[in-house]
A protein has these predicted regions:
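Membrane-associated feature with strongest affinity for ZDHHC
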Residues: 1-168
Length: 168
């Protein structure tokens, strides 16, 4: 009795091999079950904080590397799969996962794969522009928050500032 003083009731007979104050959750017969999911590691128990530095469940909640774990990094959502993360949609994670797979937050329009920094590479490698026809020139009338380009017809790749006009 009293071996696992952090589990209630403290007077119960529990096994605490790692001396962290929490009893083993699957003890031998005749011993009261505790809340320690890994009684071989003294830093693993229900009062511990999850950390990205380990590959196991630190806080006994059955999840490994929870959102917001210690030493996590912001990963930004890339819902349009253009390789650029949304500027305000982030989760602090241990690893990239699902749509939260970008470490940058440069995407000015995460609803269009043709709108991101460098989309109009013939005009700017860094400005956020929309290039719907993928001709390298940005739309002259883009949505709010997106820099205007020089393409007067962004639905036709044959009409842009880089194409020579022909007389018929």
């Amino acid at each position: 009795p009293g071996a696992a003083e952090n589990d209630a009731p403290a007077a119960a007979c529990r096994k605490d091999d790692d001396d962290d104050g929490y009893g083993e959750d699957a003890p031998p017969a005749g011993v009261t079950s505790g809340t320690d999911c890994d009684d071989a590691r003294n830093l693993v128990n229900i009062a511990a904080s999850e950390t990205c530095a380990t590959a196991y469940d630190d806080d006994c909640d059955t999840d490994t590397n929870d959102l917001g774990a210690l030493s996590c990094s912001n990963f930004y959502a890339d819902r349009d799969a253009d390789g650029f993360g949304h500027e305000t949609d982030a989760e602090c994670r241990c690893d990239a996962e699902g749509v939260y797979n970008e470490s940058d937050n440069d995407d000015c329009d995460d609803g269009s794969a043709q709108t991101h920094p460098g989309a109009a590479e013939s005009e700017s490698a860094t400005e956020c522009r929309r290039d719907e026809d993928l001709d390298g020139y940005g739309d002259v009338s883009p949505p709010s928050g997106v820099s205007a380009g020089d393409d007067c017809d962004d639905d036709d790749a044959e009409r842009n500032p880089g194409v020579n006009e022909r007389c018929s």
